[in-house]
C-alpha cells in the first residue's frame, strides 16, 4: 500500500499546526495528505490512461483540497501562504 500509517504520521508531523503525529484535523495536515494522494494518483494515471474511475477520484480529491485551501485563505492568510510555499502548490 502506498499510504501506510507511518507515512501518514510523518505527513501529519511535518505539516500539521501542532507538529505532532496525531494532528489529523488541521487544514494544513489534511491538505498535505491530499497532496500526497494526488501525486500518487497522478503517477498512476500517467501509466494507466484509461482508468476513468481513478481519474474521477483524483478530481474529487483535487476539489476537496481546493475547498480546504479556500477555507484557509479566508480564515488565516499567513497559514495559507505557508502551506502553499511548503508544498509547492500553485494557486
Swiss-Prot record:
Q: Could you tell me the keywords of this UniProt record?
A: Ribonucleoprotein, Ribosomal protein, RNA-binding, rRNA-binding
Highest lineage ranks of the organism? Bacteria, Pseudomonadati, Bacteroidota, Cytophagia, Cytophagales
Q: What does this protein do?
A: One of the primary rRNA binding proteins, it binds directly to 16S rRNA where it helps nucleate assembly of the platform of the 30S subunit by binding and bridging several RNA helices of the 16S rRNA. Forms an intersubunit bridge (bridge B4) with the 23S rRNA of the 50S subunit in the ribosome.
Subunit arrangement?
Part of the 30S ribosomal subunit. Forms a bridge to the 50S subunit in the 70S ribosome, contacting the 23S rRNA.
The name on file for this protein is: Small ribosomal subunit protein uS15
**Which protein family is it in?**
Belongs to the universal ribosomal protein uS15 family.
SUPFAM superfamilies, alphabetically? S15/NS1 RNA-binding domain
CDD domains in alphabetical order? Ribosomal_S15p_S13e
Query: Which GO terms of the molecular function aspect are on file?
Result: rRNA binding; structural constituent of ribosome
Tell me the InterPro entries matching this sequence. Answer: Ribosomal_uS15, Ribosomal_uS15_bac-type, uS15_NS1_RNA-bd_sf
Q: What GO cellular-component annotations does this UniProt entry give?
A: cytosolic small ribosomal subunit
What organism is this sequence from? Cytophaga hutchinsonii (strain ATCC 33406 / DSM 1761 / CIP 103989 / NBRC 15051 / NCIMB 9469 / D465)
**What are its GO biological-process terms?**
translation
PROSITE patterns the UniProt entry points to: RIBOSOMAL_S15
